Amino acid sequence: MEHISYPFFHSSNKTKYLCTLFLTKKRMNIRNELVKKIIEGIQDKKGQKIVVADLTEIEDTICNYFVICQGNSPSQVSVITDSIWDSVHKATGDKPLAIDGFRNAQWIAMDYSDVLVHIFLPEVREFYNIENLWADAKLTSIPDID
């Protein structure tokens, strides 16, 4: 039986660093694709005031990104949630680990492990002001689609 040696199994620090760098970059690309598909799902159903909070530079966070948006009615909040699910699943095959808030559809949270999605009614979003909880995060506003 022939022994095949893979460079990332060697113990040199340079090789470990390169392997870590490669895997980190791959994870970042996967996360970026996930965030992109989440935004597409929101925009497909006219979700508004999309904000992406990048938490990657903050220690001890529960995830790497928050994607926050709003719908104008409980039914729109539910439809946005379904659209996100479809958009992500078609592109990546991923499903959220959990979805909470469907019962009253005032605030629905979707957990994609590294990315948490929050879909609010405007008054609920204003009350909780979740963006302010992460004021030290890099916040990116995504323009509304008319």
Describe the function of each predicted region:
Residues 110-112:
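Active-site beta-strand termini and strand-to-loop segments that position acidic
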Residues 10-62, 70-108, 122-123, 133-146:
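Polybasic/polar functional segments that serve as interface/processing modules
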Residues 64, 114:
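Conserved acidic residues
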Residues 126-129:
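Switch/connector loops and helix/strand junctions flanking conserved nucleotide-binding motifs
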